[in-house]
């Protein structure tokens, strides 16, 4: 599986550098998600901009990541540009479950705003 991870203070970006997110890649991807979560990554941006095809195993990996970050931080799906990937997400109605943001830059802004909001809330509770 080809991918890159860009780690920052408030978020990490995992960019999948494969055409297909399928049953051959999904198990390794799930393992990487678990590793990043256990490493303490609070917000994960998952970039699918290179991906042209996702099967049910790929969707399962994405949903696994969403569950891992549900009560911990943010899991954001970005770069969902290919029509077949968009269609699969639409048919599966995952846009109502997942946080999907068009670009990496917008995803970073989203994480930044959420981080500021959390800091403000914790300041008012003290």
Predicted features and spans:
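Short beta-strand/loop segment at the start of cytosolic alpha/beta domains
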Residues: 1-15
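General small-molecule cofactor/ligand-binding pocket signal
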Residues: 6, 99-101
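Thr-Gly-centered strand-to-loop micro-motif
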Residues: 15-16, 23
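Short, flexible active-site-adjacent loop segments at beta-strand->alpha-helix junctions, enriched
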Residues: 18, 81, 104
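Amphipathic alpha-helical interaction surfaces in cytosolic regulatory modules
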Residues: 21-98
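A charged, well-structured terminal subsegment
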Residues: 102-125
């Amino acid at each position: 599986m080809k991918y890159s991870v860009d780690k920052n203070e408030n978020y990490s970006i995992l960019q999948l550098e494969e055409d297909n997110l399928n049953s051959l890649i999904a198990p390794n991807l799930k393992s990487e998600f678990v590793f990043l979560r256990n490493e303490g990554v609070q917000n994960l941006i998952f970039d699918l901009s290179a991906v042209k095809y996702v099967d049910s195993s790929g969707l399962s990996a994405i949903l696994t990541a969403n569950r891992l970050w549900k009560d911990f931080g943010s899991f954001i799906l970005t770069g969902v540009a290919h029509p077949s990937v968009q269609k699969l997400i639409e048919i599966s109605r995952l846009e109502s479950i997942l946080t999907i943001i068009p670009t990496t830059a917008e995803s970073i802004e989203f994480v930044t705003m959420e981080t500021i909001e959390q800091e403000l809330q914790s300041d008012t509770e003290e």
